[in-house]
Amino acid sequence: MSELKNDRFLRALMRQPVDVTPVWMMRQAGRYLPEYRASRARAGSFMDLCKNAEFACEVTLQPLERFELDAAILFSDILTIPDAMGLGLYFETGEGPRFKKTVRTEADVNALHMPDADTDLGYVMNAVRTIRRELNGRVPLIGFSGSPWTLATYMVEGGSSKDFREIKKLAYGQPELLHLLLDKLADSVADYLNAQIRAGAQAVQIFDTWGGALTAAGYLEFSLAYMKKIVSKLQREADGRPVPVILFTKNGGQWLEHIADAGADALGLDWTTEISEARRRVGDRVSLQGNMDPAALYAPPAAIRDQVSRILASFGSGSGHVFNLGHGITPDVDPEHAKVFIDAVHELSAPYHQNA
């Protein structure tokens, strides 16, 4: 593998000195880019983009051609595991992801195929290898998965949900059945992420998009416990350097102390938590990633720079911060505004690293 030319993202995750604060964006390869829309039209569908290594590589690299990003993230979907388990993933226009089958009974859980990450999900590993080769050491590559709880919400509900009624029926009425499902998912996610690391991912992120829908006790029992299990099983070194792990629970700001004790290297923050407060609460146990409101990218350039400046000042001096949005970039954002954001992070953060 090529030597890494820009490692500030990995260094910041490990709280090592950096020259400027590194930055990347969730969904940085996505519909806001006209070149992405052109690639998707050529591929035919979203899943065709994901399952073809050349297309997945092409769209992963597109934002790096436009912006001075400090990391690339594998282009894929969090629902690849449930799809490989036999649930039949498809996308309904205007409805988002759907499954042909749902998982609501013990028989449904027992019928799930336990996927082999290197064969059933081999298309993902092919994409990782292709992207690493094409990156040629330019920036690190992030692999990822959904959290067991988040994957389970889609599997039980049959797709996206506003109130999580069906999975909460299990949580309150048949918790042992939900634990059976979550345990299977935790094993699959750990295998999947380790396969990505073997294929070349240099950091991994677990997206717990719907953890914030739980009560405090429910979060610890049904979400965080299974992310901890995954973290404990991950390969934490490759190519002679650490492979950092990031946990991101949307709307999880009230549980930062618990998440900081889960064994990961960094926590993702959404925009509802003040980053200075988060830093005070977790100390130097973990790095922090985030946390500008994606909607701030609709603002004029000067206002975007002001938002970046405010968050940098809130975090303060020293390493341990990876700048990001608090969730994915939205499809109707002007790419030029994304460029203003990324350039502002590098330009305005240098004074905070003068003693590096």
From Swiss-Prot:
Swiss-Prot/TrEMBL site (Transition state stabilizer) positions: 77
GO molecular function, one term: uroporphyrinogen decarboxylase activity
The keyword Manganese is annotated on this UniProt entry: no
Keyword terms: Cytoplasm, Decarboxylase, Lyase, Porphyrin biosynthesis
Record keyword Cytoplasm present: yes
Subcellular locations according to the entry: Cytoplasm
Main location: cytoplasm
Xref: InterPro entries: UROD/MetE-like_sf (IPR038071), Uroporphyrinogen_deCO2ase_HemE (IPR006361), Uroporphyrinogen_deCOase (IPR000257)
Documented EC number(s): 4.1.1.37
Pathway listed: Porphyrin-containing compound metabolism; protoporphyrin-IX biosynthesis; coproporphyrinogen-III from 5-aminolevulinate: step 4/4
Annotated family: Belongs to the uroporphyrinogen decarboxylase family.
Subunit structure of this chain's protein: Homodimer.
Name of the featured protein: Uroporphyrinogen decarboxylase
Species assigned in the record: Hahella chejuensis (strain KCTC 2396)
Source lineage: Bacteria, Pseudomonadati, Pseudomonadota, Gammaproteobacteria, Oceanospirillales
Gene coding for it: hemE
